[in-house]
UniProtKB/Swiss-Prot annotation:
CDD domains: Argininosuccinate_lyase. Pfam families: ASL_C2, Lyase_1. This is Argininosuccinate lyase. It catalyses: 2-(N(omega)-L-arginino)succinate = fumarate + L-arginine.
């Protein structure tokens, strides 16, 4: 099959180079967007009288038929067409004859593909936002059920202070909310139309860029035709926002992987979300969070690919940009599957070992700060109280005991302000309850935050 650009050439393309040059193998993903873009363009050409009303309508009907043929499996874009744009145009010409050759008037593949990818990505951003909302609902459900479940909090992977498990999961709700906000910001820059910029300089054909932008649901148009066809910032911004989403998924995955180990035993996996070993019959493997953690690197790699792709390309459009689609397609597929998998894992794949969690917070020194705070409440300066508690910790370690094992007279050897109520202050439930500053892990604050999230998520 001859190429539309072949008249300028004296010999045909080397078969391998033809295959190397083609993008139809992956840009056929954009078939619906390409058809919608062409329908809007044909309507505009009719509106501006570049095409007659009959020609415009004939093209539109032909494009609609191609869409239906594809849905029914009667049209399958592929080689020898170079890309999805030519594949559809060739099919259109087959259907309606020479009138189909007028469709490309006033545009280039450069602005056409830029429009297609924006239409596709806009839709996928909305889908990912919905998946994030569903994940937030699952996180909320776990939090709401575990207000009074305590878990050791860590800094530097060392026991720090006890927390409400609900508070822990609310932290992830905040992270994913920021992710949703970033996606909305990216969407705003995705939703600008390059259509009508043509190859790079605009066109002398009478077109109406604002009309096609409105038809396709764009908020605005690019004001500079060179920028319109050469901009791939929006791809990088999306990949960056996606990398952050994956980093948050990877963090919670890592925690779940730790929690379900025998060493932690804070939780266990249900049979619905675990696999076994081909050799070791006792194993129950956390494949879901491990895969999410692993796929994070894949999304990071896609971001790096896109950054590298544009770092040295001069204005305006370059064939390098053909390489922007697969990283974006892969990122969308990967992040969508990981969000779904994490939601299922939270909904039906993990059960918390409450007895182990209670035992953990009752048998460590994570209430040391509260011991210092107790002395502060007795007008002991914090730095002095800190030093006193450090001495008590050291004493307990030499005796292989905990604070709760000390009798009152032992406490009072370190400071005479220790009274009988010290034991109540060291109780883990009271420790958590007392952290009632705004945004803290205190039960009252956690309930306030849960109510705030309920309004955000369900109203």
């Amino acid at each position: 099959m001859s190429k539309v650009w072949s008249n300028r050439f004296e010999s045909s393309l080397n078969p391998f180079i033809e295959e190397f040059n083609a993008s139809i193998g992956f840009d056929k993903t954009l078939i619906f967007e390409d058809i919608d873009c062409s329908i809007a363009h044909a309507k505009m050409l009719g509106k501006t009288k570049v095409l007659s009303a009959d020609e415009s309508q004939k093209i539109i009907e032909g494009l609609e038929n191609i869409k239906q043929d594809f849905i029914k499996g009667e049209f399958s874009p592929g080689a020898p067409s170079e890309d999805i744009h030519y594949s559809i145009e060739e099919k259109l010409i087959d259907l309606i004859g020479d009138t189909g050759k007028k469709l490309h008037t006033g545009r280039s593949r450069n602005d056409q593909v830029g429009t297609d990818i924006r239409l596709w990505l806009r839709k996928k951003i909305d889908t990912i936002d919905n998946l994030l909302a569903e994940l937030q609902n699952s996180l909320f459900a776990v939090a709401e059920s575990n207000i009074y479940t305590l878990i050791p909090g860590y800094t530097h992977m060392q026991r720090a202070q006890p927390l409400s498990l609900a508070h822990h999961f609310l932290a992830y709700l905040e992270m994913f909310q920021r992710d949703r906000e970033r996606l909305r910001e990216v969407r705003a820059r995705v939703n600008i139309s390059p259509l009508g910029a043509a190859a790079l300089a605009g066109t002398k054909i009478k077109i109406d860029r604002y009309f096609t932008a409105s038809e396709l649901g764009f908020d605005n148009i690019y004001k500079n035709s060179i920028d319109a066809v050469s901009d791939r910032d929006f791809c990088i911004e999306f990949a960056s926002a996606s990398a952050l989403i994956m980093s948050h998924l990877s963090r919670i995955s890592e925690e779940i992987i730790l929690w379900v180990t025998d060493e932690f035993s804070f939780a266990k996996l249900t049979d619905k979300c675990a696999t076994g070993s081909s050799l070791m019959p006792q194993k129950k493997n956390p494949d879901v969070p491990e895969l999410i953690r692993g796929k994070t690197g894949r999304v990071y790699g896609n971001l790096h690919t896109l950054l590298t792709l544009i770092k040295g390309v001069p204005l305006a459009y370059n064939k390098d940009f053909q390489e922007d689609k697969e990283p974006i397609f892969d990122t969308v597929d990967t992040i969508s599957s990981c969000l779904k998998a994490m939601r299922i894992l939270l909904d039906e794949g993990i059960e918390f070992n409450v007895d182990k969690l209670i035992d953990s917070v009752n048998n460590d020194f994570s209430n040391a700060t509260d011991l210092a705070d107790y002395l502060v409440s007795k007008q002991v300066p914090f730095r002095k109280a800190y030093q006193i508690v450090g001495d008590i910790v050291k004493y307990c370690l030499t005796k292989n005991i905990l604070f709760k094992d000390l009798n009152l007279s032992e406490f009072q050897t370190f400071h005479d302000e220790f009274k009988e109520d010290i034991y109540e202050n060291l109780n883990p439930m009271n420790v958590v309850k007392s952290r009632n500053s705004v945004g803290g892990t205190g039960f009252e604050q956690v309930e306030i935050e849960l109510n705030n999230w309920k309004k955000k998520l369900f109203t």
